[in-house]
Amino acid sequence: MKDFDSRLDTAWWALRIGLGLAPIIAGADKFFNILTDWTMYLSPLATRVVPLRAATFMHIVGVVEMIAGIVVLSRWTRIGSWVVMAWLLGIAVNLLTTGMFYDLAVRDVEIAVGAFALSQLTAVREA
């Protein structure tokens, strides 16, 4: 950590907390649908391929998201940030295949870029 510029600490902590808490909150909400009805974001392709009810599938998605958020907040931040990045890119592809929600797909790609930045900052910080 001696080569890590301490001026980057604020950015690293902001990314780590944001990319850790957001998946935990969104993942937990997959069970309650307070923020939104998450099943409406599943593409018709996904609902045909996945042999589960949409709500059941979203519960599984919620568990994965909560685990990813916890990993980001743990000592495995770099691994967690890669998982969050890949997960968000997968969500963006799903959103694009709905034929709607292009704005959300772009947002998720941008958040994935933030997760990539966190992985790179963490790598330098841990070096």
Task: For every predicted segment, state its role.
Residues 1-127:
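Membrane-interface extramembranous regions
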